[in-house]
């Protein structure tokens, strides 16, 4: 047991972690250190310290890690081009290993023997938190109340919170599970659990619904240096400010909504609606620049790496040796990913409107349909003969066997 010991709780101020504080104190008789890791939740953090203390925590940490989140988690994943199942830009998945890292640091500082989290027994986050924590310190005990307590639903949690006098931002009428950070906002649960239900127009927090976006397109220029975005519309911005600026630009144009029925690591499908405005622009721009500067073989192989990278991040294997090895490969591919991309935004759509780079592999003189002096079209005949030689030999051999069969009357 942990009677009298310190337990660090990954505290968000939401429904799950709000009821965990009194539950842990009741069942473990332990001291609760609430740790809120700020990855860009915004207004959610305004009263979080007072709320945690009122709920029974003895101490509260609020760690601002937004810059680290962007530099060490978002940008590497962006450079890798990692997208899970074609839509999900990994906003929650990237944040969890960073949160786990900070929880371990706080546990070491406080001399805590255990870390608790509010992830459910049906979701991916329990895996991400626990695998990451044990990759950093395998001696730390982990408590996952959702897997052991008698509260079987969010309705039960609401009733428990009311019984304990804990203020919560959720009602039984609006019961979405929301994860919010600098990179995205995710919505799950409630009426979204039926894939046939269209998301309600008031669901979105940071994106204007496309049908309500401006009737005129807006252009945005994004400049990259070695795969990292550094300027927006010609203005150099620090990483966090850059994401915030692109969130505003894309959001007002209805850009960045992804509605996905995804395959969870634990074996079931789930439906999530994601708002990732800045991420949608950055991924689109980064890919257009790679089309211009990467050679064919590197680009094709990087597509394979991107998928594996996405799986590793989604599955909670951020601190794995394979992910580190893939980072080294990705870093090599980004040496020439420098240039400017112009995007046209219109009612939820992102359209490439121009790209340029000092490392461009595109040569207009070679591909022009007009007169040129660098490409002899007669050379194509020899190339075609060699390129198709294996098929030609196969056809000749089949014809020869057919003639032999006919000669012997087969």
UniProtKB/Swiss-Prot annotation:
GO CC list: cytoplasm
GO molecular function, one term: argininosuccinate synthase activity
EC numbers for this chain: 6.3.4.5
Residues annotated as binding L-aspartate: 120, 124-125
Binding of L-citrulline, residues: 88, 93, 124, 128, 177, 186, 262, 274
Cross-referenced Pfam families: Arginosuc_syn_C (PF20979), Arginosuc_synth (PF00764)
Catalytic activity, reaction form: L-citrulline + L-aspartate + ATP = 2-(N(omega)-L-arginino)succinate + AMP + diphosphate + H(+)
Entry's localization field: Cytoplasm
Span of the signal peptide: none
Keywords attached to this entry: Amino-acid biosynthesis, Arginine biosynthesis, ATP-binding, Cytoplasm, Ligase, Nucleotide-binding
Gene Ontology biological process terms from the UniProt entry: argininosuccinate metabolic process; L-arginine biosynthetic process; urea cycle
Source organism, top-level taxon: Bacteria
CDD domains noted in UniProt: ASS
InterPro entries: Arginosuc_syn_C, Arginosuc_syn_N, Arginosuc_synth, Arginosuc_synth_CS, Arginosuc_synth_type_1_subfam, AS_cat/multimer_dom_body, Rossmann-like_a/b/a_fold
Pathway the protein acts in: Amino-acid biosynthesis; L-arginine biosynthesis; L-arginine from L-ornithine and carbamoyl phosphate: step 2/3
Binding annotation for ATP: 10-18, 118
PROSITE patterns: ARGININOSUCCIN_SYN_1, ARGININOSUCCIN_SYN_2
Keyword Coiled coil: no
Family indicated by similarity: Belongs to the argininosuccinate synthase family. Type 1 subfamily.
PANTHER family named among the record's database cross-references: ARGININOSUCCINATE SYNTHASE
Subunit details: Homotetramer.
Protein's name according to its UniProt entry: Argininosuccinate synthase
Organism this protein belongs to: Thermoanaerobacter sp. (strain X514)
Encoding gene, per UniProt annotation: argG
């Amino acid at each position: 047991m942990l009677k009298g010991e310190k337990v660090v709780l990954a505290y968000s101020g939401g429904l799950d972690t709000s009821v965990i504080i009194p539950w842990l104190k009741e069942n473990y008789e332990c001291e609760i250190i609430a740790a809120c890791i700020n990855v860009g939740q915004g207004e959610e953090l305004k009263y979080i310290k007072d709320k945690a203390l009122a709920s029974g925590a003895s101490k509260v940490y609020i760690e601002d890690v937004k810059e680290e989140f962007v530099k060490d988690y978002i940008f590497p994943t962006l450079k890798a081009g990692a997208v899970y199942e074609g839509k999900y830009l990994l906003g929650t998945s990237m944040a969890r290993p960073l949160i786990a890292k900070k929880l371990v640091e706080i546990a070491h500082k406080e001399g805590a023997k255990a870390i608790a989290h509010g992830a459910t027994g049906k979701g991916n986050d329990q895996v991400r938190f626990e695998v990451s924590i044990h990759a950093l310190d395998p001696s730390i005990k982990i408590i996952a109340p959702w897997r052991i307590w008698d509260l079987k639903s969010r309705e039960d949690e609401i009733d428990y919170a009311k019984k304990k006098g804990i203020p919560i931002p959720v009602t039984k009428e609006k019961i979405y599970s929301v994860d919010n950070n600098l990179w995205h906002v995710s919505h799950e649960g409630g009426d979204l659990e039926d894939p046939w239900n269209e998301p309600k127009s008031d669901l979105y927090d940071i994106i204007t619904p496309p049908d309500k976006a401006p009737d005129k397109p807006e252009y945005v220029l994004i400049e990259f240096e070695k795969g990292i975005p550094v300027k927006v519309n010609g203005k150099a911005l620090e990483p966090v400010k850059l994401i915030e600026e692109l969130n505003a630009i894309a959001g007002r144009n209805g850009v960045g909504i992804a509605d996905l029925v995804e395959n969870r690591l634990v074996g079931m499908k789930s439906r999530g609606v994601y708002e990732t405005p800045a991420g949608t622009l950055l991924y689109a721009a980064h890919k257009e620049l790679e089309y211009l500067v990467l050679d064919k073989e590197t680009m094709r192989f990087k597509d394979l790496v991107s998928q594996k990278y996405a799986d590793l991040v989604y599955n909670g294997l951020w601190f794995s040796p394979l992910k580190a090895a893939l980072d080294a490969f990705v870093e090599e591919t980004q040496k020439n990913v420098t240039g400017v991309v112009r995007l046209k935004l219109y009612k939820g759509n992102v359209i490439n409107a121009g790209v340029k780079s000092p490392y461009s592999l595109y040569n207009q003189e070679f591909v022009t349909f007009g007169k040129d002096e660098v490409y002899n079209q007669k050379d194509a005949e020899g190339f075609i003969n060699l390129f198709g030689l294996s098929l030609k030999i196969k056809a000749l051999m089949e014809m020869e066997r057919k003639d032999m069969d006919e000669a012997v009357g087969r």
